[in-house]
Amino acid sequence: MAIVEIDSLDFPGVELFSSLTEKQLRHSYEKGNGVFIVESPKVIDRALIEGYEPLALLCEQRHVVGDAAEIISRCGDIPVYTGSRELLASLTGYVLTRGVLCAMRRPAELSVEEVCRDARRVVVIDGVVDATNVGAMFRSAAALGIDAVLMTRTSCDPLNRRAVRVSMGAVFSIPWTWIDCPVSDLNRYGFRTAAMALTDNSVSIDDAALLAEPRLAIVMGNEGDGLPAATIAAADYVVRIPMARGIDSLNVAAAAAVAFWQLR
């Protein structure tokens, strides 16, 4: 490894951590699969365990021989850019979580067939745009026995920096990919689909037939608008979570956790 002391915001080599947007990162780095940013030693550790390739580290000076020392030792021959807490916060636009960031190469995109081949329970995240919600849903999915996650392209990228951090690295341990036509694609692979929505014909989440399905895809919609009407109409089930005290809905990440637990 090479420890490189930076002394300015335009220091050569640090543009991955400063000037590139999330979209630019996805399409950067020699026309490969792109790059994403991971923060905190614990989450970087999860990524390394799952085989993700580190490209560069950005680390506060005090953490080089502290919290980040083990991570640095495991990342091989990559540059480790270091500077003061204040300089790095100015460079990135935020205070580094636990003082360290890692730029990593995005993996090759999996096919829907690869992700679903051995799965029994999957979730479709359809149009969920908030990174915190996506990260929380991945963490719940991994913890509560969901086998795979399928994302529509209107959803937030699961490898968004904040989504990765909120998931605590769960995005690295559960298979996921993008999907274009959730209901028809999943029906073709032998799944019945359960759209989480409030409609006149919705069934309770504890419905016996629903629970007995051998392969089930739970479809979660946008934070404000929910699922598209066409998706609801095409689903095999429309499912509601019974609630009390006149409450008719939950935050999408909270609703997803309830659904994952009940339908596992």
Predicted regions and their residues:
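Active-site/ligand-binding-proximal alpha/beta "capping" segment
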Residues: A195-I247
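Structured adenosyl-cofactor binding patch, chiefly the S-adenosyl-L-methionine
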Residues: V100-C102, S140-L144, R153-F172, A229-R264
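Glycine- and other small-residue-rich loops at beta-strand/loop junctions that grip anionic moieties
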Residues: I6, F36, D126-G127, T152-R153, ...
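RNA substrate-binding interface of SAM-dependent RNA methyltransferases
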Residues: I49, T82, R105-N201
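Short acidic-hydrophobic, aromatic-tinged amphipathic segments that line or gate anion-handling sites
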Residues: I3-S8, P79-S84, I174-P182, V239
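Glycine/small-residue-rich loop that forms an oxyanion/phosphate-binding "nest" at active or ligand-binding sites
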Residues: I72-T97
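Boundary-proximal intrinsically disordered activation/regulatory segments immediately upstream
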Residues: M1-D67, S155-C156
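Short, aromatic/basic amphipathic alpha-helical patches
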Residues: G66-D77, A230-T231
